[in-house]
């Protein structure tokens, strides 16, 4: 099965982490899925992804001390595979796993995803639990010196032992039976562990064998640009940054990362800028103080514009059931979503500490887009010259009317190019028709 078939366009969806951390339950997943189906599905949003710790008993019980409990009791089946805890996912009882929840999400016209950690549970190794289809136990395929630096749940696997591949095969056979459409694998993308490179390939092989199209997302970043082709051969998304939050310095730094990764997107293969910290977030972290995103309105538009013109996946992090009207409007701009889904030839024209310019072509709309970003701390006038932007492929905007996406205004460029007055941390996104 061609892995790219399951993600011909950059995925769009929701991930539970930014609000719920390790604590989301089935009722909350269903509520967010129902909201997406009612308000976002028609615009292309489709994935509902449960992030980390859906298998951990007592998750969040000591959140003031630990994000991930040391020596936590993890729920497993007889073959060392993590399964949902029934106290948070009651429909998973009696061995049903995530199948009932996935069926419900599919009934809404959506797709279902889960988060996993690289490797196999340390608890399974300690208990010498069996590996399906082999004579080995979990301790025999695990590398006890290969532990994630920030999460204590798992051991990395030994690529030199064929049974390690069989363990991953058994995982994805289980996920396929559950009806999983998307898997985010953590502690793997930036290849901190010596086995991470090989384990990326093992995950891909397991998906190929499971006879179900499953999007594979690798985390956390920063991904290695030298591994770009390896990611593209084996995964659909790979994080180019560590966790992204609602901070202007992090957003400004994303321009550097996108510059590095421009030209690496193709159907089924997407450099990933991480989740969109919009709306209400942070409700289940240490201090339990949820917050409205710290990004200003202009910064939110800058983020959405950069993600979409670059062609990154869109994964919302908010508690969706409490989205305000302005955030919902931001997430349902059909023109911007078309650019994210269908855009081609995205390239950075220039970048300095104070400004950046990107362009891309959307064949679906037959439009060329020009995004001018003000990265400085004050309102500025920024000029772009025709010879910087127009190419023979895209045609010239000389003499054409330019339409501004965010305001709906029209402008005609001056003889030498385009001038725009842009607020601090803001953006003007122009387009012209190639008809």
Predicted regions and their residues:
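Mature N-terminal, pre-catalytic/accessory segment of carbohydrate-active enzymes
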Residues: 1-19, 23-25
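Structural recognition of the beta-strand scaffold that forms the well-ordered cores
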Residues: 11-16, 46-51, 111-116, 181-186, ...
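Active-site beta-loop-alpha junctions enriched in small/polar residues
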Residues: 17-19, 53-55, 117-121, 188-190, ...
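Carbohydrate-binding surface patches
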Residues: 301, 307-310, 315-317, 351-393, ...
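Catalytic cores of secreted or luminal carbohydrate-active enzymes
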Residues: 302-350
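C-terminal beta-strand-rich structural cap/linker in extracellular carbohydrate-active enzymes
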Residues: 413-435
């Amino acid at each position: 099965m061609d892995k790219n078939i399951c993600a011909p366009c950059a995925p769009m969806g929701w991930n539970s982490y930014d609000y719920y951390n390790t604590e989301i339950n089935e009722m909350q997943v269903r509520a967010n899925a129902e909201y997406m189906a009612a308000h976002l599905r028609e615009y292309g949003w489709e994935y509902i992804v449960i992030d980390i710790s859906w298998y951990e008993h007592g998750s969040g019980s000591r959140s003031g001390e630990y994000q991930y409990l040391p020596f936590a009791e993890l729920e497993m089946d007889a073959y060392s595979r993590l399964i949902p805890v029934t106290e948070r996912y009651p429909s998973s009882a009696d061995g049903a796993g995530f199948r009932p929840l996935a069926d419900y999400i599919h009934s809404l016209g959506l797709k279902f995803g889960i988060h996993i950690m690289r490797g196999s549970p340390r608890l399974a190794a300690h208990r010498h639990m069996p590996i399906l289809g082999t004579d080995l136990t979990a301790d025999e395929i695990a590398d006890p010196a290969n532990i994630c630096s920030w999460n204590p749940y798992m051991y990395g696997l030994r690529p030199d032992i064929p049974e390690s591949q069989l363990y991953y095969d058994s995982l994805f056979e289980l996920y396929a039976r559950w009806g999983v459409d998307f898997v985010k694998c953590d502690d793997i993308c930036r290849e901190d562990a010596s086995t991470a490179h090989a384990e990326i390939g093992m995950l891909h092989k397991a998906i190929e064998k499971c006879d179900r199209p499953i999007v594979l997302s690798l985390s956390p970043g920063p991904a290695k640009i030298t591994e770009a082709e390896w990611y593209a051969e084996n995964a659909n998304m790979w994080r180019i940054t560590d966790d992204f939050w609602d901070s202007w310095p992090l957003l400004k730094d994303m321009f550097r990362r996108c510059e590095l990764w421009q030209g690496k997107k193709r159907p089924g293969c997407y450099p990933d800028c991480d989740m969109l910290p919009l709306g209400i977030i942070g409700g289940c972290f240490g201090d339990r103080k949820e917050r409205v995103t710290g990004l200003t309105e202009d910064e939110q538009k800058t983020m959405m514009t950069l993600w979409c013109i670059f062609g990154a996946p869109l994964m919302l992090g908010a508690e969706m059931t409490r989205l305000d009207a302005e955030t919902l409007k931001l997430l349902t701009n059909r023109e911007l979503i078309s650019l994210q889904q269908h855009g081609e030839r995205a390239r950075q024209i220039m970048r300095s500490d104070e400004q950046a310019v990107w362009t891309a072509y959307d064949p679906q709309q037959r439009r060329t887009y020009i995004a001018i970003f003000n990265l400085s701390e004050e309102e500025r006038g920024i000029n772009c010259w025709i010879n910087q932007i127009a190419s023979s492929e895209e045609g010239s905007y000389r003499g054409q009317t330019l339409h501004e996406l965010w305001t709906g205004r029209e402008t005609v460029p001056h003889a030498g190019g385009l001038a725009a007055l842009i607020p601090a941390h803001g953006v003007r996104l122009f387009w012209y028709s190639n008809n």
